[in-house]
Amino acid sequence: MMTKNLGWLATPLLTLIAPAAHAEWALNMPKGITDVSRSVYGLHMLTFWICVWIAVFVFGWMIYSIVVFRHSKGAVPDTKLVHNTKAEIIWTTIPVLILIGLAVPATKTLIETDDASNSQLTIRVTGYQWKWGYEYVGSGVSLLSTLDEKSNAARQLGSGIDPFTVEHYLLNVDHPLVVPAGTKVRLLITAQDVIHSWWLPVLAIKKDAIPGFVNEAWFKIDAGAIGTYRGQCAELCGRDHGFMPIVVEVKSKDDFDAWIKTQQAASAAAAAAAAAPAAAPAATPAAAPAKAS
């Protein structure tokens, strides 16, 4: 009977230990690849350690009081002590000082995250059910980013494909958002249908995409942070909410400029091909044959 019970306990433990097939996870937020993300991380850790020390003090004092002043040791309640001005001043002043100490860096970080002025590149981000649209404002380049074919095939019921064999399962797309490193990029985030949320942890950005409303965010990625970074929609937006990942590919400025030129050339060629049939002259109808007299 005990072996059977241990088996039931082992199942959830193994589930927790096993690597997730559909997502990467961590116990803490990442430091990120921007100055703002590191500021957010620092604020988060400052708050965390303050809470830890408060918990250690409060629970430590409670446990000490319970053990030392327990009834079995002959302790009796003190009915005379009902008020202590000095103690009340201390336990009021300390929380106020803690809140002020947190408010200063929090306000500084909040102001920094909202300052999208002097951006060098503007990208319009639009959420759809269930994909993301990216438009590079002023460059004539736009793209739709959807779940890649391998992940889409593996997620289908009865596909027979083991998700563990798919690289970056449910976290890969056909067309990633390409951005340059060392450049201040401004995002204008909105949605076409329902509320979505554009969330990329390494940038410390999580902004709702709301139909008829534009939210603003910005980032400037470290010059040495060339690579690919992944996020997800963080707002329940319908049936396929879990299947519209966010992938950002960071390139050097030179590589990004070359990529933009390639995309512009491809867009121009596609537009020319689409306009060609409309520009061709209509065929002259054949003359009707003359009637025999």
Q: What function would you assign to each model-found segment?
A:
Residues 1-24:
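N-terminal secretory/membrane targeting signals
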Residues 23-46, 66-293:
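Non-transmembrane, membrane-proximal soluble domains of secreted or membrane proteins
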Residues 44-69:
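Alpha-helical transmembrane segments
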